[in-house]
Amino acid sequence: MLCLVYLGFAARLFVASLYSDRPELSSLQRAVRLDPTNADYRNHVGRYYALVARDPATAIDPYRAAAQLNPHAARYWFDLASAYQVLGDISNQTWALEHAIQSDPATPDVAWEAANFFLVQGEDEKALHEFRVVLDNEPTMAGAAIQFCWRIHPDADILLRDVVPARPLDFYQAVGQRLACQGELP
């Protein structure tokens, strides 16, 4: 008997995964009904509303549900922040961004995306802080990050103080490697 229950449960999850791979809204909604605790399926529904139906207001609930089901996935919080941005809801966008950063505070990709959101909001200091996280954790991105930061705030003293990592040797080695690869060093 227990084996049949397990088999039924596994079959339901398998069918849900099949529905989740289809790009139609009805299939995505079926996947959510079959496996309501799967955050990915909820996020797919939100992405459908935001990107295909171009209805960011309707995307909010599925995005929020995905983020609540798995609050440690920065992607869900960024998708929610994007929907709030399109709606012009800056306070909720900032709230979602803060959760994205909390969920993954040291990953360079997360910090880079957060920095871009903050730039759009006009929050240059927060953006520079996130670029600092990028440089602290991925020195190979130093060249691109510094160029970006220079466009935001073309003041070498501020960038050295607020953006360049405390371990300058790693940073300078990464910049030197980037310049050497681009043929800008003798």
What are these regions (language model features)?
Residues 2-26, 30:
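Hydrophobic alpha-helical transmembrane segments in integral membrane proteins
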Residues 34-37, 71, 105, 136-140, ...:
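Short coil turns that delineate tetratricopeptide repeat
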Residues 41, 76, 110, 141-145, ...:
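TPR alpha-solenoid repeat register
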Residues 49, 84, 118, 148-149, ...:
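Residue at a conserved register position within TPR or TPR-like alpha-solenoid repeats
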